[in-house]
Amino acid sequence: VYTNTVPVDAYRGAGRPEATYLVERIMETAARELGVSPAELRRKNFITEFPHQTPVIMAYDAGDYEASLSAAMAASDYDGFPARKAEAESRGMRRGIGMSCYIEACGIAPSQAVGSLGAGVGLWESAEVRVNPVGTVEVLTGSHSHGQGHETTFAQLISDRFGLPTDNVQIVHGDTDKVQFGMGTYGSRSGAVGMSAIVKALDKVEAKAKKIAAHLLEASESDIEIAGGEVSVAGTDKKLGWHEVCLAAYTAHNLPDGMEPGLKEGAFYDPTNFTFPAGCYICEVEVDPATGEVEIVQFVAADDFGKIINPMIVEGQVHGGLAQGIGQALLENAHYDESGQLVTASYNDCLLYTSDAADDYFWG
């Protein structure tokens, strides 16, 4: 294909918005043709039995799509919209409400599945956890962070596991001189795949640390607990500091027979399936027919993400997605004149949805 337009590339959720738009517009059109509520038509067509095998390899393992729809409808007072619409019309305004339900395939994998579709690489992820003699932890990951907050979330994972301050955890990524081979950050896979590789490495580190502690404290491995920066024997007052166990691993003066010195482990993780978050978004707008001005009255986002590691980062991701969607729907466009000249070549002409334009939205 030859074109004189400027090159473009995906910046988030490549292909998914277009596919979702098509499906949701079909649902809206069908509801109007059938004379039924768009919400109830969606509800009647939700998948309710799991696991659900799709025609394209993937199997939905679990989901409660009615819950997110009901939550969004309640938060937006969906049933009260006709009254609000009538009130707007009394002022000469036009008011509309729209909803969109989605299911997303995240954590792109497993390698065998994508290989059958023609992928030239495996889609596992790797990690290495290095515990230093003083008890600080260094995590090397193939999942690169470019705004997703890996440094915070990954450090929080280690902090919660061993009871260490996050300042004692260093996340290393993006340096090919240090980090072992990884499959990268895309397809919403850093948490589901990248963090799972870290967890597998942490499991090995914890198991070895407990063996060392059990040997030093003359206790059973099954009785060893690690919490709050201490390694203790359950039901007793016998304990060691986390740093003491780490130092013992490296001095190697008193290790179990046959154990190698050090406290460093690596792991690979190749998931058996994708993960499938889902949700429902409802937007209510008011339009001034005289000027064309659009006001977003409210925007409700109800998402089912499963277990959330850091709610603040996840909420920020949702806010960013809302801003991008609003910008794409109302403002942003690459416009060319009849001679093929790009007329939206600067921020003076290409409108972006900015933080000062964003209002308060509901998120749950």
Go through the PLM ranges and name each one.
Residues 1-67, 74-355:
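Cofactor-binding beta-sheet edge motifs in enzyme active sites
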Residues 353-364:
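Single conserved hydrophobic/aromatic residue that forms the stacking wall/gate
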